[in-house]
């Protein structure tokens, strides 16, 4: 009888321990993501409809590319997406997002890339971008972090 009581107490204790372990287990966030102070330097990119037809950009169909964003640290892979865009008019913002979804504008590895095809379709003006930066368990929105300025002709060089 004493043996059965000890066995029952042992089983109850073991069950309580298992239930305690299961109840205390919860999903732990993987890694980290730090974006405080994240910025582009310079924080804008000039994009042109008409480029010099003899330039390397024209002959090799090279896109317009920003400098890589600085100040982002986190567990790899760290991913970047266009979160939103503000423009002078709603239709310009919609066109920008459409070109992004078509892959003619991209945010890759902290670089903003505008193809020549996209640059010819965008209307003149300023496009202020907000980016989503994320990894497995973390994300941040970098609001109004970069500006693309679209004009007809290349800026004159000194």
Predicted regions and their residues:
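Non-catalytic macromolecular-recognition regions in eukaryotic signaling proteins
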Residues: 26-158
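Bacterial Sec-dependent N-terminal signal peptides
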Residues: 1-8, 16-42
């Amino acid at each position: 009888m004493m043996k059965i009581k000890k066995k029952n107490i042992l089983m109850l204790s073991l069950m309580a321990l298992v239930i305690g372990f299961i109840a205390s287990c919860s999903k732990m966030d993987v890694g980290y993501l730090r974006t405080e102070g994240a910025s582009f330097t310079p924080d804008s990119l000039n994009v042109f409809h008409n480029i010099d037809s003899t330039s390397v950009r024209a002959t090799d169909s090279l896109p317009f590319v920003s400098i890589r964003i600085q100040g982002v640290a986190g567990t790899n892979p760290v991913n970047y997406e266009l979160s939103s865009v503000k423009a002078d008019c709603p239709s310009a913002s919609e066109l920008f997002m459409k070109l992004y979804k078509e892959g003619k504008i991209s945010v890759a590895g902290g670089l903003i890339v505008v193809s020549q095809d996209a640059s010819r379709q965008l209307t003149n003006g300023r496009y202020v971008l907000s980016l989503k930066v994320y990894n497995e368990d973390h994300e941040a929105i970098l609001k109004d972090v970069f500006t693309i300025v679209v004009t007809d002709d290349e800026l004159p060089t000194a």
